[in-house]
Amino acid sequence: MEPRALVTALSLGLSLCSLGLLVTAIFTDHWYETDPRRHKESCERSRAGADPPDQKNRLMPLSHLPLRDSPPLGRRLLPGGPGRSDPESWRSLLGLGGLDAECGRPLFATYSGLWRKCYFLGIDRDIDTLILKGIAQRCTAIKYHFSQPIRLRNIPFNLTKTIQQDEWHLLHLRRITAGFLGMAVAVLLCGCIVATVSFFWEESLTQHVAGLLFLMTGIFCTISLCTYAASVSYDLNRVPKLIYSLPHDVEHGYSWSIFCAWCSLGFIVAAGGLCIAYPFISRTKIAHLKSGRDSTV
C-alpha cells in the first residue's frame, strides 16, 4: 500500500472511531452527575436525636415532605406587613423557609445528558419509593423551548424577571450545545464519505478536503463542549442560590458521556491533522530528493 493510501486509511479509521464516540455521547445521559450521599450523611449526623420518635422510622420526615397542610395562598399574609417584599417574606410565603438550611432541601442522586435528567435507582430509598409508586418520574425531558413560568403572587417582580432571564440564557446555551453537536456529526459523516472516495478518485484533492472537514468537525465539537460547560456553571450559579446551587459537600461533576465526546474530539483532530499535513510532508521529501539528485549530478 502506498504511503498516501496508508495515511488516508489511518485517518478514516480515526474518523470512524470519532463518529462512534460522538454518537454514543449524544444519545447517552451521563454527561453530568450529582451524588448527595455524603451531604445526607453529614445532615443525619447533625440532626441525630432532633426528630420526634414517631418520625425517625419514616423514609422522609414530615418536615421534608413536599405536600403539607397549609392555608390557601390568598389567605396568607406576608410576615412584617403587606408592604414587605424582601426574600425572607416570599420564601416563607411559599413554604421555602426551610431551604435556608443546607439540610432542608431534598437532594437526590441524578445523572443528566443533552435530552433527559434522571434519578439513580438503588441509592436513595426515598426517591426509589416515590418512583415505584408513580408519584415521581424517574426521567424528565430537558427543555429546548421557552415556556412562560407561572407568575406567583407576592414574589418581588425583580426576582421573577431575573429567573425568567436566566432561564432564557440557559435555553440559548442548551440550543447552541445541541446544534453544534448535530452539525459536527453531519460534517464528520461527510468527511468520512470523502475520505472513502479518495481511495478511488483524485486521491490528493479528496484527502485534503476530508482533512478540512475533519478539522471543521473539531471546531464544532470544541464550541459545543465549551458551551455545555458554560451552561452547567451558569445553572449552578443562578439566583436564588437556595434553589439552584448545591451544598459544598454534594459530589458533582462530569461523567463518561462527555469524556466520550472529548475523546471523539481528539481523534478527529488527529485525523484532520494527518490528512492536511501529509501532502506538505510528501512535497518536502520530494523537494529534498530532487535537490539531492541535482547535487550528485
Swiss-Prot record:
Disulfide bonds: none annotated. Disruption phenotype: Mice are osteopenic and are more susceptible to inflammatory bone loss, owing to enhanced osteoclast formation. The keyword Endoplasmic reticulum applies. Residues 41-57 have a biased composition (Basic and acidic residues). Residues 26-179, 230-257 are extracellular. Interacts with STIM1. Acts as a negative regulator of osteoclast differentiation in basal and inflammatory conditions by regulating TNFSF11-induced Ca (2+) fluxes, thereby controlling the induction of NFATC1. This is Transmembrane protein 178A. It comes from Mus musculus (Mouse). The gene is Tmem178a.
